[in-house]
Each structure stands twice: as C-alpha cells, then as structure tokens.
Amino acid sequence: MAISNKQKAAIAAIVLVGGVATGGVLLSGRSAPEEQGGHSESKGHGDTEHHGKQAAEADHKDDKSHGDGEHHEVKKGPNGGALFSRDGYDVEIGTAESKGEARIRLWVSKSGKAVANGVAATGQLVRATGESQALKFVVSGDALESQQPVAEPHVFDVTANVTLPGSSSPLAVRLSKEEGKIELTADQLAKTGVVVQTAGSAKVQAGVQFPGEIRFNEDKTAHVVPRLAGVVESVPANIGQQVKKGQVLAVIASTGLSDQRSELLAAQKRLDLARVTYDREKKLWEQKISAEQDYLSARNALQEAQISVQNAQQKLTAIGASNSSTALNRYELRAPFDGMIVEKHISLGEAVADNANVFTLSDLSSVWAEFVVSAKDVERVRIGEKASINSASSDVKADGTVSYVGSLLGEQTRTAKARVTLTNPQMAWRPGLFVTVDVFGADVEVPVAVKTEAVQDVNGESVVFVAVQGGFVPQPVKVGRTNGKVIEIVEGLKPGARYAAANSFVLKAELGKSSAEHGH
C-alpha cells in the first residue's frame, strides 16, 4: 500500500507526540520479546509496527513488500475508532455518547470477545490550543470509558496507556480527531483577508453592560400643531420626508386667521387716519390756530393706533402666519427646524383643531441610547463616563458619554433611566433599534483578551477561531469585560494562542457551509 509523504509526516508527528506523552513508549508499546510473539503471523514485516489480525489480513497482503521503518495509517476498528493489537488483544479507542456527553471509550477484546475486567487505563487529551486534560477510565458495560466528558470542538489528540491482563507494561494507543476543522492553505488565507494575532494580556476598562434602545432625542423632537382651527386644503409633506426649517408642511383654511388678518388691516387703516389727523393738529397748534388740547388728543389717538397695529402683527407672528392681505384665511403650517417627519396625522379636507398634533418632527442627526439601571448598578453609572453602543442586529458601533442618569428610582421597578447622546450623521441609529450599552470605569489588566470582532456567535455560543496546523478550529469561549475594541476571555483560550482577529466572519461562513454539507 503506497503512503503519501503527507500521511507519513502526520503519522511521524503522532508517534513523536505520543512518545513524549507516554515517557518514551514506542507506538507498539511492546518490549522486544513481546514483539517477537506478536508477529509470529507476520514474518514478512521488517518494520516495528503492530496491527490487529483482521487489519493485517485486509490491508497487509503486501507485507513482504514493506521496507524497514515504514509507518502505516492507523487501522479502524468495528466501532469506528483507532485499532491497536498486542499479545492477542485488540484495543480500539474512539468517542461515544454517554449520559448526553461525548467521552473517550476503550473497547478491549480477545478472540472477538469483549474483555473489561483486569484492564486499566489512564490517558491525556491535548487540544489544538495547547490545553491538556487528564483522563481516568472506568468500566462501563463491556468497555472502559473516560470519567471526564469531552467538550466541543472535537479537535484533539488523545494518548491512553492501557494495561492488559497479565501484561507488565502498558500499551500506548492514540486517537486524533479533527471534527469541525476549517482547512485553509496559506494562499486561501491570504485571499480571505483573515488576520491572525496572538491572544494575550490587555487593559480593559472595567464596566457593566446594559440592554438599551435607540430613542428620539426629545430635545430635538417637536409635536407640530396648527394653533388655529380650520380645514386642510393641501398637505405637501409626507411621513419619512426630510424637511428644512420654514418649509410648508400643510395649508389650512382658517376663519380665525381671516379674522386676525382683518383686524390687522383695520388697525393699519386707523393708524393711517390717526397719523394724518395728528400731523394736521400739530401744524395748527404750532401756528396757534387750534388749542393744545386738540393736538394732544390727536397724538394720543396716533399712539393707540400704533399699539393696535403692533398687537395685531404680534398675534400673527405668534402663530407663524404672514401679513398677507390677499388670501386672508390661508394658513401655511411650516417646519420649526430641520428634521424628519416621523408621524403624520393630517389629510386633505380634514377639519383640524387648533391643538391637534398633526405632525411629529425630529432631528435625527442626534439620538438617545436609553437604558435602565438597577439599584445595585446606579453607583457604577455616572454622568460623563465613557460608553460604547453596539447594535444588536448589525455591526454598527459608536462611542459616547453618559449624558443623563435619573436621580429617582421607580417605585415599582426600583430602577433608574440613563442615556447616552449619540451623533447620527449617517442615520445609522434608528429609533426603536435594540442596542447593548457598555459603560466603562477604570482600566483593568486581564490575562487573556482578543479583538472584539474575533468573537463570533455560533449556534448561540461565543466562539473564537483558533489557528492550528493547516487551518482553524472553532473554540468555544466565555467572554468577560470589553471596551468595545478588545474583549476579555474568561474561559476557553490561553495566552499565546493564535486566533483569527479580523474577518473571522469568513470562517464562520465556511463552518456553516461544512456543517450543511455534513448534514447532507
């Protein structure tokens, strides 16, 4: 059987790792005398390998053609595990579900019959991240099973030392698993744009996280009312439209406005008459033709007329109406500032009251990220503290400062409202959007941290893609504090581990593809 160089290298690496783990025990685990006994049926072999009888018959018909020192692929046992043999015993190592969890299992048999009594085993599991786990085996039915469950991902190497009945030295058996590994060559890695960095200590601002929601900036939101009752003649503005200050939103025919404009016109006419009378009486008084009392009365009438005109003008100004003398009942409702129409409660031909909320206008260039703070966290959230806002449904992020913390707790909820004011020039933050608000305190040194974008959600679990030989492995992690740029890893990753820091979403997509293909 021809073995590729890649396979030879892989097996050689397994032999080397296993040799170190077992204190220099060779792959076969035999002493020289046992070797002779174990190969009585395979005289054609000139190497030091050892296989089960079935494996020898199935895969070693060309025994005599093997050269010395050649390594072979690990044989597969009836349970799908790796099969090893010595002194007439077959030992298979694999994984099996037990009590709802994956465990390492050893099946020992002799002459086709299961053997469990008199067999003892210990082992060690080494993950791609370098983490190791000691394994203890106990009898479970007709096999031996690890007391410790094996968590995902199932990418690891296991070495177990199995002491067989009547044997003075243990048999070293090995199992390698690469379930879920995403294989990428160096060229493929370069094309994807995945950037690999090393996990290590970092300064993270100690903080607390709150669920929140984007809301209108109430300081820049207005309910537009007509201030005059009337009938709607036209509505050029629509909901969702961006409008400028002074732009016409609606035109209303109002009898009240007609009365006010008529009052202004009448006051202006009276003013004109009073001015003419005053000028005449002043001239006559100066010429000593008329009495001073007539002059003073004319001056007083002029001043009263001026006051009447000013009063009528201010009434129109207060409601935002012009001094038009043509269409006396035409009232143009205009935008009080630049903003977006977010609500509209007016239509053509409708009769509206003077206090009806016909439009809601909001300047969305600034919004609030509101969140609720429990009583135990109130002291940790203060005005002016830095905060990071992350969208729950997109990759939008922003930094800001806490602008308000309620001074009173709700009687029922025992919580206080707080908010962060955000600039929103691109309109990325839309009111109603759910967000996560991280409020930061003092800097804290954490032993393991990674880039925030390196953490992906896979089936509801936080995952970091760890770089291994020939690809990446999805490593479940438990995250801690974050400042929006780096995030603390509490469990699942050790310092020095190399991980996908940027564009890890590409690996998540590849993982999803491979899972779908595996499902078919």
Swiss-Prot record:
Q: Which residues cross the membrane?
A: 9-29
| Reported biotechnological use | In the presence of 2 mM Cd(2+) or 4-10 mM Zn(2+) up to 99% of the metal is removed from the culture supernatant and is sequestered via bioprecipitation. Additionally Cu(2+), Co(2+), Ni(2+), Pb(2+), Y(3+) and Ge(4+) can also be removed from culture supernatants, although it is not clear which efflux system is responsible for all these substrates.
Q: How does it sit in the membrane?
A: Single-pass membrane protein
Q: Which GO terms describe its molecular function?
A: metal ion transmembrane transporter activity; transition metal ion binding
An example of a Gene Ontology cellular component annotation for this protein is: outer membrane-bounded periplasmic space
Q: Its GO biological process terms?
A: copper ion export; plasma membrane copper ion transport; response to cadmium ion
Q: Induced by what?
A: By zinc, cadmium and cobalt (zinc being the best and cobalt being the worst inducer).
The places in or outside the cell where this protein is found are: Cell inner membrane
Keyword Signal in record: no
What Pfam families does the annotation carry?
CusB_dom_1 (PF00529), HlyD_D23 (PF16576)
- Coiled-coil stretches noted in the UniProt entry, renumbered to this chain: 286-320
Q: In which residue ranges is the amino acid composition biased (Basic and acidic residues)?
A: 32-76
Chief place of localization: membrane
Keywords of this entry: Cadmium resistance, Cell inner membrane, Cell membrane, Cobalt, Coiled coil, Membrane, Plasmid, Transmembrane, Transmembrane helix, Transport, Zinc
- Function statement: CzcA and CzcB together would act in zinc efflux nearly as effectively as the complete czc efflux system (CzcABC). The CzcB protein is thought to funnel zinc cations to the CzcA transport protein.
What NCBIfam families does its record include? 8a0102, RND_mfp
Record's family? Answer: Belongs to the membrane fusion protein (MFP) (TC 8.A.1) family.
Protein's recorded name: Cobalt-zinc-cadmium resistance protein CzcB
